[in-house]
Amino acid sequence: MANQNGFCIKKQQVDPLNWEMAAESLRGSHLDEVKRMVAEFRKPAVKLGGETLTVAQVARIASRDNAVAVELSEEARAGVKASSDWVMDSMNKGTDSYGVTTGFGATSHRRTKQGGALQKELIRFLNAGIFGNATESCHTLPHSATRAAMLVRINTLLQGYSGIRFEILEAITKLLNHNITPCLPLRGTITASGDLVPLSYIAGLITGRPNSKAVGPNGETLNAEEALRLSRSGRRIFRVASPRKGLPSLMAPPLVLGMASMVLFEANVLAVLSEVLSAIFAEVMNGKPEFTDHLTHKLKHHPGQIEAAAIMEHILDGSSYVKAAQKLHEMDPLQKPKQDRYALRTSPQWLGPQIEVIRAATKMIEREINSVNDNPLIDVARSKALHGGNFQGTPIGVSMDNSRLALASIGKLLFAQFSELVNDYYNNGLPSNLTAGRNPSLDYGFKGAEIAMASYCSELQFLANPVTNHVQSAEQHNQDVNSLGLISARKTAEAVDVLKLMSSTYLVALCQAIDLRFLEENLRNAVKNAVTQVAKRTLTVGANGELHPARFCEKDLLRVVDREYVFAYADDPCSANYPLMQKLRQALVDHALQNGENEKNTGTSIFLKVAAFEDELKAVLPKEVEAARIAVESGNPAIPNRIKECRSYPLYKFVREGLGTELLTGEKVRSPGEECDKVFTAMCEGSIIDPLLECLKSWDGAPLPIC
């Protein structure tokens, strides 16, 4: 601001460094943020004005959904035209301008007055990518990433600091709205002066280069002329006559920003999913819910941890599994671990920092997709071309590296939980490998899935290695530091994909565990009924109808059934090698030893009742166990599935009913991979989002009060 004498006066500014704005953007819960992202993703139109684009909107346009349209703000037209006119006026006056009358980068000392020819050469020499033969060796960027990049580039150019013509932005918008996607090379950018090599192919398409290709709405291959005609751009191709047609299209990192936006949309959803999966893990493992108590996390102060714990606390609050587990913990408490293992007990502390990192990265990318990243920047108000470095993609490379590390940490936790879940030494009574068949010798359940999980986890941990520390000096040492943003974003996209493989496999395993707890409860009930019936028939009265001392054994016999893991004997409940029969006999023997002088009398001896009890039980128990199993399989169980009384039920219901999965056994043809594939596809399509959020619909965004 200048006074009447022409001196610049410093104007008082609020939040001049934007720290307050950055902090304000993190207000509220992460879950609310994800809900807003999902709502934005589902809007039918994206209106671009240069400053309000979101990660979710970019992800939506990337999906090639015909139901969503891109609209340009007419209010931006004047600013874009003003900067374009300024460039033309500057050139007509003979002003020396970078990229208009000069060469590029390290060769900017060269000069020319042939602005159109210079732009044409810029696009030609940057067309240096390799595509491969598209069969065994395809090096084409995913079309979703290209669409995302086009959207981001339009948005940043709309702010009117780049010198480009508005009709170019309209042409790119029409390509998007007609589902016509330029073919870009997968590799070849260091995200220094933007993603120059890949983006040159977009410029090549709209200017009619013969090597330019696009993919049409039905997957057909189009040349430049066909692409522009189908997009109804109103012309065949754009002739390269403007001195600022090529450079503004290229000088920015929209490619990496588009991919980063897609990646972070999914990463945020996966972060919430990991919280809910950890809570379900606590349910099926009969975990102690006190690990979510708010005081513990309040004393640590980290918002991500506090929210993760509060979400898990909400799922576990009132859970039928937690209520049942409380009774188990009260039984023989001195013979059981006092606390759960780290993968369960410290899951909020583990997930909290990852959520904070992913959320911070999301905000950083949203600032970037609404930034002006060109060089030079055209300041029409001051009649200046400012030569700077906003094209440097360091915020993107760093945020992608950080996000990838967070994703790897989430995957590590899921693998640790999965490993406990399938191991009968740790899983509190579930069968080894989560086998559900009648014969464990012919059913190995999730053994293959565990091997696959180890593979996924190893790859994910490798992908966590940073990219940004591998910078090489480029372009004759002009681009001697560069962000490697797109490489990092590509690796983060791979990490998201691998984490989805892990999450889908883990969710199928959790549903298997839920059904096994359901089966376990019904089998135990059948065993208790059988023991009760046999005890009453064989232990209540003596040979002459008199009451027998053995009648007092029934309570201890039922206590044995409660204490023994059902799946430790369910395949052959009367086997002498399994613990049930051994401990039932021991309970009778203990009573006999306390029977004193009565044992000398055949009419009152408990020892003499043991054989009759065991023989009768062997005749009854296998039939009762099989009948209970059949009742569960046919949908007529004596005891309903507890999951229906839990807040985690919507996710289970979606996997079982929505996707048509089932309890896996060695007796059936269906394999674990088939079920995991269904869940993975649902994750990729986004259909898992609604049941996930349904689990948390009643959460008020705060922990339970400390009482």
Swiss-Prot record:
What does the UniProt function comment say about this protein?
A: This is a key enzyme of plant metabolism catalyzing the first reaction in the biosynthesis from L-phenylalanine of a wide variety of natural products based on the phenylpropane skeleton.
**Where along the chain is the active site annotated?**
98 (proton donor/acceptor)
Task: Identify the metabolic or biological route this protein is part of.
Answer: Phenylpropanoid metabolism; trans-cinnamate biosynthesis; trans-cinnamate from L-phenylalanine: step 1/1
Q: Where in the sequence is 2,3-didehydroalanine (Ser) found?
A: 193
User: Which GO terms of the molecular function aspect are on file?
Assistant: phenylalanine ammonia-lyase activity
Q: What is this protein called?
A: Phenylalanine ammonia-lyase
Query: Which PANTHER family is this protein grouped with?
Result: HISTIDINE AMMONIA-LYASE
Location comes to: Cytoplasm
Indicate the family of this protein: Belongs to the PAL/histidase family.
Write out the PTM section of this UniProt entry.
Answer: Contains an active site 4-methylidene-imidazol-5-one (MIO), which is formed autocatalytically by cyclization and dehydration of residues Ala-Ser-Gly.
Listed GO cellular component terms?
cytoplasm
Cross-link 5-imidazolinone (Ala-Gly) - where? Answer: 192-194
- List the keywords (alphabetical): Cytoplasm, Lyase, Phenylalanine catabolism, Phenylpropanoid metabolism
Which reactions are catalysed by this chain?
A: L-phenylalanine = (E)-cinnamate + NH4(+)
- Please give the subunit comment from the record: Homotetramer.
Q: Name one GO biological process term.
A: cinnamic acid biosynthetic process
Residues reported to bind (E)-cinnamate: 339, 345, 375, 447, 475, 478
The lineage's top-level taxon is Eukaryota
EC id: 4.3.1.24
